[in-house]
């Protein structure tokens, strides 16, 4: 896994990103694995709870599908793509702190079968563009 650092934040180069600090890893069968970025988890600090997306729910790109709760704040989880939620990371219900420890790996949040991938993929940010966003914000 190649990574780039922006100050104390890590951005991996093997995935795409959103303006709302989610990451997306796409597979050949249009299934996307989605989580929140290192930048997002460090801003939230100690994550204490999560409301996971509803399995088999059809969602639109940009729709709020869940909530992450930290000692400091609550933040919506947005779906970066339209499609159907096919899997959620139930481990996070008992151990939401995994997101703090490993946001890009064990801390993945949900998987989605994308329905409009070709048109929506263009709206996602490359690692370089996401770094520009972090530097600007």
From Swiss-Prot:
GO terms for biological process: glycine decarboxylation via glycine cleavage system. The modification N6-lipoyllysine is found at residue 72. The keyword Membrane does not apply. GO terms for cellular component: glycine cleavage complex. Binds 1 lipoyl cofactor covalently. It holds the Pfam family GCV_H. Residues 31-113 form the Lipoyl-binding domain. InterPro entries: Biotin_lipoyl, GCV_H, GCV_H/Fam206, GCV_H_sub, Single_hybrid_motif. Its cofactor is (R)-lipoate. The keyword Signal does not apply. Belongs to the GcvH family. This is Probable glycine cleavage system H protein 1. The lineage of its organism: Archaea, Thermoproteota, Thermoprotei, Sulfolobales, Sulfolobaceae.
């Amino acid at each position: 896994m190649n990574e780039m650092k922006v100050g104390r934040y890590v951005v991996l180069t093997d995935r795409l990103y959103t303006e709302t600090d989610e990451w997306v890893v796409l597979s050949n069968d249009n299934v996307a694995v989605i989580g929140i970025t290192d930048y997002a988890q460090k801003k939230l600090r100690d994550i204490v709870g999560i409301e996971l997306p509803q399995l088999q729910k059809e969602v639109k790109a940009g729709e709020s599908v869940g909530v992450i709760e930290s000692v400091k704040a609550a933040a919506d989880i947005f779906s970066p793509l339209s499609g159907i939620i096919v899997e959620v990371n139930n481990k996070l219900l008992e151990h939401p702190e995994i997101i703090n420890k490993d946001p890009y790996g064990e801390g993945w949040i949900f998987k989605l079968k994308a329905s409009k991938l070709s048109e929506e993929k263009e709206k996602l940010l490359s690692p370089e563009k996401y770094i520009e966003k972090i530097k600007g914000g």
